[in-house]
């Protein structure tokens, strides 16, 4: 496996892969790799000749007073995880490599899709995501790019960007990977105290109860949202940011009844750590 920390070097590697007609899979990450990331890398390795994993804590997607400085940076371990999962290249640029100028070009998806859910409290977040991912698409010339469904809003925003800007890349959205006790894998789980970690299990439990209610015929949006909120609030240290439902694709409003394919998403704080999770409710 090659560790590449230079834009020019990555371009040279990619040009050679393309000359050899090799298909390229891209797995964009912010590092602190865990089994969720490994599953994305593994999927890419199975479906492509070459897998490039980017490791970059992207400053432009963090707002003021968010956890940019505290975000775990573990490049040495990330390389081990990536290699074991089947990566061929780890691309770990510095900030100045991807953002060489103070005055810069932004790639921004507008409309409600970036204003609801996480966009409501993190207004600059998705602009940072789409800007850095568009740079990574251009540099990697990837045929396929791999993202986890845990960041469901992000995947919808990126789908819009790919469609609108005619990126010649296939988005592969992979299932949420969970701990044995149900907690969704996240690099931010490392921030949780033992008490917070135990309380955070209420997230997957609340979504499981919602899925059961839906499976048993409940289609009333308010009833399911209240079920999830009440379940989460049974954990005293939980602070709900949002529990909401939107139609898929495109995150459109749902109305009073669940019809078609719907995203039930939540964001909840335990102490200072904000966790997200979701489930898709769909009539089969």
Can you annotate each of these PLM segments?
Residues 227-284:
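Phosphate/ribose-recognition catalytic cores of enzymes acting on nucleotide-derived substrates
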Residues 2-237, 250, 280:
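Nucleotidyltransferase catalytic core that binds NTPs
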């Amino acid at each position: 496996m090659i560790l590449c920390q230079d834009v020019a070097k990555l371009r040279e590697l990619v040009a050679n892969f393309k000359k050899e007609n090799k298909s390229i899979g891209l797995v964009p990450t912010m590092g602190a790799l865990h089994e969720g990331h490994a599953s994305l890398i593994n999927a890419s390795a199975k479906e492509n000749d070459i897998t490039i994993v980017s490791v970059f804590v992207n400053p432009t997607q963090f707002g003021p007073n968010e956890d940019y400085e505290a975000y775990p940076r573990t490049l040495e371990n990330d390389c081990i995880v990536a290699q074991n999962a089947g990566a061929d290249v780890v691309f770990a640029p510095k900030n100045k490599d991807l953002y060489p100028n103070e005055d810069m070009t932004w790639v921004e998806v507008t409309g409600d899709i970036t204003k609801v859910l996480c966009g409501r409290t993190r207004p600059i977040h998705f602009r940072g995501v789409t800007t850095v991912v568009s740079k990574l698409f251009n540099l990697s010339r990837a045929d396929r790019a791999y993202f986890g469904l845990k960041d469901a809003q992000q995947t919808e925003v990126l789908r819009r960007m790919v469609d609108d800007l005619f990126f010649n890349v296939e988005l592969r959205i992979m299932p949420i990977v969970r701990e044995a006790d149900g907690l969704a894998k996240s690099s931010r789980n490392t921030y949780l105290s033992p008490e917070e970690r135990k309380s955070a299990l209420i997230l997957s439990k609340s979504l499981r109860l919602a899925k059961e209610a839906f499976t048993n015929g409940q289609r009333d949006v308010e009833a399911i949202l209240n079920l999830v909120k009440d379940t989460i609030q049974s954990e005293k240290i939980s602070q709900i940011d949002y529990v909401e439902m939107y139609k898929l694709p495109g995150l459109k409003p749902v109305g009073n009844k669940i019809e078609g394919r719907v995203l039930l998403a939540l964001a909840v704080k335990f102490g200072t750590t904000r966790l997200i999770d979701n489930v898709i409710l769909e009539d089969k």
